Amino acid sequence: MLGRCFPPDTKEKQQLRMTKLCDPAESELSPFLITLILAVLLAEYLIGIIANGFIMAIHAAEWVQNKAVSTSGRILVFLSVSRIALQSLMMLEITISSTSLSFYSEDAVYYAFKISFIFLNFCSLWFAAWLSFFYFVKIANFSYPLFLKLRWRITGLIPWLLWLSVFISFSHSMFCINIXTVYCNNSFPIHSSNSTKKTYLSEINVVGLAFFFNLGIVTPLIMFILTATLLILSLKRHTLHMGSNATGSNDPSMEAHMGAIKATSYFLILYIFNAVALFIYLSNMFDINSLWNNLCQIIMAAYPASHSILLIQDNPGLRRAWKRLQLRLHLYPKEWTL
């Protein structure tokens, strides 16, 4: 998301109403590289929307047909809806900020994008963390009484936890408005010449920033890391036990366990990269038009798409539905030619 520039020590800084823009910061990137980045981002957005739309459609159809949906399916519906909305929002924001910067920089428009962006990102982080938590409780092999009690109650807890995550994400997105503001200094002298250079400064509420990121990003990140790591360790231990019983490396159960370990490891890596990129991006560590800032955007756009594709490949029901869809798409052109 692009930032705005507020001239310091003005009424606009105090009132934050219909602020005049400073001239956009000079881009460090060539036009070709900017075009390439935009093309990559748009491709990632479209892939993410298609993949998450497929996941949502399959589980929504199951929900309507059976008047019920599995707990994992419920989480996936919440997750896919948040990601479709997020990818669509980011694609719309790039389009508006590139074609009508003055309209995008109006207070109402800018803050609508800012709040929606953070809300949907935090929802996505929380829903993915609850999905990892659910898989951990259902699959991991631990015999602790508290863990067994949690496994028995997890189905009833998940709907409440999902809506609690929505409330937490919305609260944090509303709280974020005055955490960081970018200011423009129009009269920074260049000592080697008689000219001046435009510089951009950030003012950050450190206490608010710490509270904001701890509950919004760090908490679901820690939960995801812990549950995914414990699940991998449990699966690895069970796999070693199966190997010691000489079941053979080609045993379907052994292959299923190894596949689950790989999938969980990929999920963990993707989640960490996305959370770190989001943290850096929202912290305003780099200039708006810098290569590092654009790299964070690419990572954030790639995560929903790649994670959803892995979910389709790893879930037998979704994988079968995807193959049926591919088969129908291949048959339609043949029917049209008859």
From Swiss-Prot:
Keyword set, alphabetical order: G-protein coupled receptor, Glycoprotein, Membrane, Receptor, Sensory transduction, Taste, Transducer, Transmembrane, Transmembrane helix
Residue intervals passing through the bilayer: 31-51, 75-95, 117-137, 157-177, 206-226, 263-283, 292-312
Chief location bin: membrane
Residues on Cytoplasmic side: 52-74, 138-156, 227-262, 313-338
Membrane topology note: Multi-pass membrane protein
A single GO BP: detection of chemical stimulus involved in sensory perception of bitter taste
UniProt-recorded name of the protein: Taste receptor type 2 member 39
Gene label: TAS2R39
